[in-house]
Amino acid sequence: MDWDLITERNIQLFIQLAGLAERPLATNMFWRQGQYETYLNYHNGRIHLCQILKQTFLDEELLFKALANWKPAAFQGIPQRLFLLRDGLAMSCSPPLSSSAELWLRLHHRQIKFLESQCVHG
């Protein structure tokens, strides 16, 4: 792991604030909670945060609907990548270098809220 102490503490705080199961820190971490999968990765000095909402039924138009409904202001202008997987809709981003666990938590919650607003639960 090549992160600094501040990044390490932010990762620990994010895990705690998000209510994710504690585990040894690693550059690639994954949690499954209900219909959601959360990924937190650290690569080349950047944090990458991804949510996947698992779905049993995916409409091929879902990605286009989500892209049309995405509003940058809801994510404090941080670009989000939206993509369809075989079994869910995913949303990921890379917060600014100087950001902290509190921003990551807001993004985490907004990603979940956005995905829920776009998906049919089944």
UniProtKB/Swiss-Prot annotation:
Induction: Induced when grown in an acidic environment. Repressed by methyl-3,4-dephostatin. One of its GO terms (biological process) is protein transport. Keywords: Protein transport, Transport. This is Secretion system apparatus protein SsaM. It comes from Salmonella typhimurium (strain LT2 / SGSC1412 / ATCC 700720). The gene is ssaM.
